Amino acid sequence: MFKPGPLYNKRYHIMERLRKVSLETGDVFYNGSNVRGPLGIPFGGLIQLFTKSIYSHATVTLVEEGEYYAIDVSDYGCRKLRIIDWFDNWGVEDFCVVRLKEKKTDDEERFKVAIKKFLDEDPDYDFTFNNPDAYYCTESVKRIYGELGYDLGGSYLIKDIVPRWFYPILQIGSLVTKITSGASLPTNVEISIVGNERKGMLASPLMRKIIAYDGKEFTYFS
C-alpha cells in the first residue's frame, strides 16, 4: 500500500522552485536517507550522525524534453524516475542540489551518454557496500562523473568515518555475521559519503550548491 512521505503534498511547489533554477543534466541531489546496509544497520542515519551531515544519499539528474528525472540507486534497485514522482515516498525533507562549477561545452551530452550506459547496465544495489558488480547511491554518482573525468572525492575507509570507540563494535559484528551468514561490512574498502562542506563529496571543489531546502524554506545560491 502506498504511503506518501513528507514531501508528497509539497511536490508541485518544490518542482516550481526547481524549475526556477533550471536543473541541468548532471546536477546532483544530496538528501537524507534511512537506508539500511549490511547486518540491517541503519547505515544512512549513522553516516549522517558520524559525518555531522543532514545528507547521506546522492542522485544524478537527467533532463529530457523539459522533464526532470532522477537516476536513483537504492534498495529498490537502479531506477529512472520523474523527480516529481521520486519525491512521493521520501522519508525525509532536507535536500540540496549541486552543480559543476565549470562545465565544458559538451558535458551535457557526455553526461547523457554516461547515464544511458549506466541505465542499460541496470546494476543491482550494493547491499554490502563492497560488491564490485553492484552500486550504492554515492558510488553511482561518482561512476557517472568519472566517465567524464571528474573525481568528486569523498571516499574513505569506515575507520576514518566513525568514532574510534565505535569501530571495534562494527568489526566484531561484521566478523560474527560473516561467519553466520557470509555478509560483512566493507572495512577494507573505501566507501563514498556525501558528508559536509569539510569532508565528503559535498566538499568537492568542483561543485557548487544552487538550491537547498530544509523542509520549510528554500535557499538559493549564486
Predicted regions and their residues:
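Cysteine-nucleophile amide-bond enzymes
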Residues: 1-222
